């Protein structure tokens, strides 16, 4: 029994030794004891170990995995979250703000040369001033329009609410009306900005008394501070005009902002360049009234004041300023109203609507491009068909001409032993051309007769006669091509034969 165990162990040891000799390369991975004959096999095996998937712990069925498939909708949503569709801020906005602040800081606060309008002595009701703002191309952070102030009068106890905007350093003209008593104060300055303030008061024929004291104002600075400014009440070199009647019921005027003085901030956001171009085109199509023009209606009392010079391309507000009575609605311009409505709609569009319109325009452009390409391809196909038909006609014509040439060659070869050729050989008409085997064709000047002269080389073999016949056939074809427009072929007469035939007879 012990002997058998010893033999078995010896055999196993021998097998292991032989195996280790045959496959000396052992895999060092944990749990794997495979051996390989060469190092390449071992490297491939180790690579399999490295590429083995490592699964984590078993997941429960209750766990819901969020779908992260990158669909177009999710892509657009991510773009919106990141802010790719937001309009970029203008790089010059901060510079404009800084420049306006610097101009405000450098502006002198002594406004003594300024003049103030004349206010009536006794007023039954407070005067009301309605102003609408017209944007300037420059961004203005705050408003410098002063609050309503109580103006001390000489013989009155009721206040007057007035809104005054310092647009320049002078008030050149003051227009006063006695009938229907409307005070129109219009600033017409040569600077590129102008301002108009229309003040309405009830009917009164009281005398006009200037304000004895200074006119107080509050100037709002961009940093939030409020600074009181005193303006003297004396008016220097002002022209006072008293027309017959200028009825004004609801005056509305535009108060454009002045460069260097921040005006009322625009309620609308900064618009994109495309919107600005669109609005510029609309403004050019409907040009507004020029600055300083006051149109007075004969029966309706329509007054329009426009300050267009203040902004060459102000694109965020309607361009016209109209003051009219309710009794004259026919003077309103529907074209201007529709233009302003379109601008408001363009300003209030949401990004989804913009994107939808953009996609619609892209689809329309793509369809137009496809239609143009289709028309172009159809024209090319038609041209190719025409060229192929023309090519077929030319090929058929070439085939007919080749058949005709072959028939004529056969006819000439059949008449190679003609007695006319024999007579020509005997006469020795072309003795000089025997060496070069050439041919000469002589056409008489007579319109009714043609003479075809053949030249041949008198050789003993038949090969030379065959080549001679082919040369003669070529010459005849050339002759026929030259005289295809002439009448039917006339009698063929050889020049030497006409002289040698009587002698032979």
Curated annotation (Swiss-Prot):
InterPro entries named among the record's database cross-references: bZIP, bZIP_sf, bZIP_transcription_factors, TF_CRE-BP1-typ, Znf_C2H2_sf, Znf_C2H2_type
Predominant location: nucleus
Residue numbers covered by motif Nuclear export signal 2 (C-NES): 405-414
Basic and acidic residues composition bias: residue spans: 346-363
Post-translational modification: Phosphorylation of Thr-69 by MAPK14 and MAPK11, and at Thr-71 by MAPK1/ERK2, MAPK3/ERK1, MAPK11, MAPK12 and MAPK14 in response to external stimulus like insulin causes increased transcriptional activity. Phosphorylated by PLK3 following hyperosmotic stress. Also phosphorylated and activated by JNK and CaMK4. ATM-mediated phosphorylation at Ser-490 and Ser-498 stimulates its function in DNA damage response. Phosphorylation at Ser-62, Thr-73 and Ser-121 activates its transcriptional activity. Phosphorylation at Thr-69 or Thr-71 enhances acetylation of histones H2B and H4.
Region (Disordered): 125-155, 259-373, 425-472
Comp. bias (Low complexity): 318-334, 455-467
Tissue: Ubiquitously expressed, with more abundant expression in the brain.
Pfam families: bZIP_1
Chain intervals for the UniProt region annotation (Leucine-zipper): 380-408
Annotated zinc fingers (C2H2-type), start-end: 25-49
Region named Essential for its histone acetyltransferase activity: 296-299
Record-listed N6-acetyllysine modification sites: 357, 374
Chain positions found as Phosphoserine: 62, 90, 112, 121, 136, 328, 340, 367, 442, 446, 490, 498
Effect of residue 71 to A: Impairs phosphorylation by PLK3. Weak histone acetyltransferase activity
Short sequence motif Nuclear export signal 1 (N-NES): positions: 1-7
GO BP: abducens nucleus development; adipose tissue development; apoptotic process involved in development; BMP signaling pathway; brainstem development; cellular response to anisomycin; cellular response to leucine starvation; cellular response to oxidative stress
UniProt cross-references to CDD domains, sorted A to Z: bZIP_ATF2, GCN4_cent
Domain named bZIP: residues: 352-415
Subcellular localization(s) per the UniProt record: Nucleus; Cytoplasm; Mitochondrion outer membrane
Domain notes: The nuclear export signal 1 (N-NES) negatively regulates its nuclear localization and transcriptional activity.
Name the UniProt record assigns to this protein: Cyclic AMP-dependent transcription factor ATF-2
Organism: Homo sapiens
Lineage: Eukaryota, Metazoa, Chordata, Craniata, Vertebrata
Recorded name of the encoding gene: ATF2
